[in-house]
UniProtKB/Swiss-Prot annotation:
It is found in: Spore wall. It comes from Enterocytozoon bieneusi (strain H348). Glycans are attached at N88. The gene is SWP12. Residues 115-195 form a coiled coil. The lineage of its organism: Eukaryota, Fungi, Fungi incertae sedis, Microsporidia, Enterocytozoonidae. One of its GO terms (cellular component) is spore wall. GO terms for biological process: sporulation resulting in formation of a cellular spore. Gene3D superfamilies: Arfaptin homology (AH) domain/BAR domain. This is Spore wall protein 12.
Length: 228
């Protein structure tokens, strides 16, 4: 690992033009495609995290908590905890139900509280499903690390071989060994990148994210149906 890191730094500091060495046909094209798919994984992880945890932060969340605490103080009800926005919204409805005397308004506040309590439950169910998606993305990320490690090895081999050939001073057996390593390692990692691009299941994961979120939105809408 130390030698690979050292060679990586050397390649960055002392760049050379590749004249005598070639990668397997199609290697660079599949590498570009692989890197695009790899980078999409990180973007999808951010999307999943955003959809999973949005209810725990932000200005809206702080305002709801602040409002609920004020209502609680005015009615001698214990101030709410900093939970998710749906649970806090439910608490707001419950606390308002305790502050009003009008029976009809009290009923609306109670129904409001119940609806958002149920939405909070649905959101927790959605979050659990999103955890499975996160696991899938993490597994793909681990595979990417393995592929990237092998890609760096190929780059180091090519660099060493090109440097050797440009020096015009080398032993034939060393040249032959590096050429064989470049060819074999290059083809192997090319196959891995090709398989990853075709089997990464990115499209399936995107569909799964949308489906999970859709199920939550529909369930939340059903709980709010009575307020039409």
């Amino acid at each position: 690992m130390y030698q690979e890191t050292k060679r990586y730094i050397e390649r960055k500091l002392k760049k050379i033009e590749y004249i005598y060495t070639k990668l397997p046909d199609g290697y660079e094209d599949i590498e570009i495609r692989y890197r695009k798919v790899r980078d999409e994984i990180g973007i999808l992880q951010n999307v999943v995290n955003g959809l999973t945890y949005y209810e725990y932060g932000g200005t809206v969340m702080k305002n709801v908590a602040h409002w609920a605490n004020i209502v609680g103080e005015s009615t001698n009800i214990n101030a709410i905890k900093r939970e998710d926005i749906y649970t806090n919204t439910s608490t707001v409805g419950m606390q308002l139900a305790h502050t009003v005397s009008d029976k009809s308004l009290k009923e609306v506040c109670t129904e409001f509280s119940t609806a958002y309590e149920n939405i909070a439950i649905e959101k927790r169910k959605m979050n659990e499903k999103m955890e499975d998606v996160t696991d899938e993305l993490n597994n793909l990320k681990k595979k990417c690390k393995q592929i990237d490690h092998q890609r760096h090895i190929v780059k180091n081999i090519r660099y060493d071989l090109e440097e050797l050939l440009q020096s015009n001073v080398y032993k034939e057996d060393i040249k032959n060994r590096l050429e064989k390593k470049l060819e074999s390692n290059g083809k192997e990692i090319q196959e891995q990148m090709t398989d990853f691009v075709h089997l990464s299941m990115i499209n399936g994961i995107i569909v799964k994210i949308a489906k999970i979120h859709k199920e939550f939105c529909e369930a939340a809408g059903n709980h709010l149906e009575k307020f039409n």
